[in-house]
Amino acid sequence: MKVNDRVTVKTDGGPRRPGVVLAVEEFNEGTMYLVSLEDYPLGIWFFNESGHPDGIFVEKME
């Protein structure tokens, strides 16, 4: 995924939420995405852990 991609994010206790990627940071363990959400327009960071399906919080919108 890259900046400006439309995505959904997994959050605790609710359905996936739509957002837009504002920034991407790569790490050995996975990727951090700064995602703008309706109630966090300036963005909130989510981490996708490499190699662990349960650690995937950001997915590209179809």
UniProtKB/Swiss-Prot annotation:
<dbReference type="Pfam" id="PF10781">
    <property type="entry name" value="DSRB"/>
</dbReference>
<dbReference type="InterPro" id="IPR019717">
    <property type="entry name" value="Dextransucrase_DSRB"/>
</dbReference>
<comment type="similarity">
    <text>Belongs to the DsrB family.</text>
</comment>
<protein>
    <recommendedName>
        <fullName>Protein DsrB</fullName>
    </recommendedName>
</protein>
